[in-house]
Amino acid sequence: MLVLVLGDLHIPHRCNTLPAKFKKLLVPGKIQHILCTGNLCTKESYDYLKTLAGDVHIVRGDFDENLNYPEQKVVTVGQFKIGLIHGHQVIPWGDMASLALLQRQLDVDILISGHTHKFEAFENENKFYINPGSATGAYSALESNITPSFVLMDIQASTVVTYVYQLIGDDVKVERIEYKKS
């Protein structure tokens, strides 16, 4: 089962569109679920995601026009409970102890957060944490030189194989990370 994880697009305020090389990779009909950390900013970005997969889950970012998106969401995909937040609620941003506390409160196997615009994926105390970064490479409050990135999770039974796509220069680099639920 393929799950696209992305966020912080900031279209059209900070970027015009997704990188063309990413759009070529994101083909309708291949992805079953989309988990978005927010800051899509417009309905057009949401509509684009709906063309890629029927099951789209979005949480509200601090720049989203649609205030109906929830602050946080828990989604079950296969054997995994996945928590989804934007990340501006985590103080300091991206802080491991704060993320771990939120993971315990939501009682999830995987916690997905954004806001920092920097890709991260790691295991801590048998739980998995993912920050997909910014799919467009939009600048953040702390940094202007952001590497565009998104994550594709392949969920099979009690294993998640995470593929990280990063646009470095003119090339899309892919890294593979595996997490097994214990």
Curated annotation (Swiss-Prot):
The keyword ATP-binding does not apply. It comes from Danio rerio. Its main location: cytoplasm. Component of the commander complex consisting of the CCC subcomplex and the retriever subcomplex. Component of the heterotrimeric retriever complex formed by vps26c, vps29 and vps35l; within the complex interacts with vps35l. Component of the heterotrimeric retromer cargo-selective complex (CSC), also described as vacuolar protein sorting subcomplex (VPS), formed by vps26 (vps26a or vps26b), vps29 and vps35. The CSC has a highly elongated structure with vps26 and vps29 binding independently at opposite distal ends of vps35 as central platform. One of its GO terms (cellular component) is endosome membrane. Keywords: Cytoplasm, Endosome, Membrane, Metal-binding, Protein transport, Transport, Zinc. The keyword Magnesium does not apply. GO terms for molecular function: metal ion binding. It is found in: Cytoplasm; Membrane; Endosome membrane. Coiled coil: none annotated. Belongs to the VPS29 family. Pfam families: Metallophos_2. Component of the commander complex that is essential for endosomal recycling of transmembrane cargos; the commander complex is composed of the CCC subcomplex and the retriever subcomplex. Component of the retriever complex, which is a heterotrimeric complex related to retromer cargo-selective complex (CSC) and essential for retromer-independent retrieval and recycling of numerous cargos. Component of the retromer cargo-selective complex (CSC). It is a peripheral membrane protein. GO terms for biological process: endocytic recycling; intracellular protein transport; retrograde transport, endosome to Golgi. It comes from the Eukaryota. This is Vacuolar protein sorting-associated protein 29. InterPro entries: Calcineurin-like_PHP_lpxH, Metallo-depent_PP-like, Phosphodiesterase_MJ0936/Vps29, Vps29.
